[in-house]
Amino acid sequence: MDQYSNLFAFEDYLGAQARSIPDLPEVDVLSPRVVRVLGGNPGQMQLQGTNTYILGTGAERLLIDSGQGRARWEQLMASLAAEHKFRISTVLLTHWHLDHTGGVPHLFRIFPELRGANAIYKYHPDPSQQAIVDGQVFSVEGATVRAVFTPGHSTDHMCFLLQEEEAIFTGDTVLGHGTTGVEDLEEYMQSLRKIQSLGCRIGYPGHGAVIENMQQKVQQEIDRKQRRERQVLLALQNIQREKRTVGDANGAATQAELIEAIFGRLPADVADRFFAPYMKDILMKMARDKQVGFRFKGGQKHWFANVSQENPVCR
């Protein structure tokens, strides 16, 4: 299992996704230039399914993401194209994950002219695909989008700013419900602040309902991740204090001790497989921020807080 898959098991993510989420229609007209088509792949990770978006008002339309490759999505796309007499001329993929890219072969069946047209774009393109450059502009009648490089959820993640609306297609960087998995926390936080600086009002996410207050949602994501950092720092302080009372002058904690302090006692395979990658990432970010440090002992990193014990971090 890769790090991306592991990340979906983290407590923040699963706790948020466990809450009830609203039903979404398979096809929904969100604005005069945006139609959402569900990917037909509902699940714990995908929520109601992957959102794919048809943009534009003319005979040629732009598509953001292609779902996971489900037959139902192909049927919906073919039906919409026939009914409204349009074709997809450009496909923009937010990132490499299969639930966003798996429908590309289905598009070739619906729109055979796409094959060989150099019209499929991704940050790290597959053979026969084209690269996306940060700031690159794509347009069709009625819709103009600008690519915004937002790594963190994945190394290649792109969001797309819709210039005709105060809106942004967020992919998996910000979801309509709950929070997302993160591969690189430091990059993710930078991407959130980059999105926030754009001042968008509406978010069209890769999963879940439309985000009606984008600025508020992004701030909630920033706050959530910062709370987790504070929790780790507080746990380190407590462990250091406890160890020093029993004569351990260094008082540093292993990653495993931190996981147990924060999440409770877990089966070893669960802690190692699901929580260890998350804890490693957050500790490395905090080390770069000089909030924590580590020393090697017995071949392991032992972590300590770089703050005064007389000034403990608030919960």
UniProtKB/Swiss-Prot annotation:
InterPro entries: LACTB2-like_MBL-fold, Metallo-B-lactamas, RibonucZ/Hydroxyglut_hydro, Sec-metab_biosynth-thioest, WH-like_DNA-bd_sf. SUPFAM superfamilies: Metallo-hydrolase/oxidoreductase. Zn(2+) 2 binds at D99, H100. It catalyses: atrochrysone carboxyl-[ACP] + H2O = atrochrysone carboxylate + holo-[ACP] + H(+). Binds 2 Zn(2+) ions per subunit. Zn(2+) 1 binds at H95, H97. Its EC number is 3.1.2.-. Disruption phenotype: Abolishes the production of endocrocin. Its cofactor is Zn(2+). Signal peptide: none annotated. Endocrocin and related anthraquinones compounds have interesting activities for medicinal uses, including anti-inflammatory activity. The active site is at D99 (proton donor/acceptor). The keyword Zinc applies. One of its GO terms (molecular function) is hydrolase activity. CDD domains: LACTB2-like_MBL-fold. One of its GO terms (biological process) is secondary metabolite biosynthetic process. Pfam families: Lactamase_B. Belongs to the metallo-beta-lactamase superfamily. Atrochrysone carboxyl ACP thioesterase; part of the gene cluster that mediates the biosynthesis of endocrocin, a simple anthraquinone interesting for many biotechnological applications. The pathway begins with the synthesis of atrochrysone thioester by the polyketide synthase (PKS) encA. The atrochrysone carboxyl ACP thioesterase encB then breaks the thioester bond and releases the atrochrysone carboxylic acid from encA. The atrochrysone carboxylic acid is then converted to endocrocin anthrone which is further oxidized into endocrocin by the anthrone oxygenase encC. This is Atrochrysone carboxyl ACP thioesterase. It comes from Aspergillus fumigatus (strain ATCC MYA-4609 / CBS 101355 / FGSC A1100 / Af293). The gene is encB.
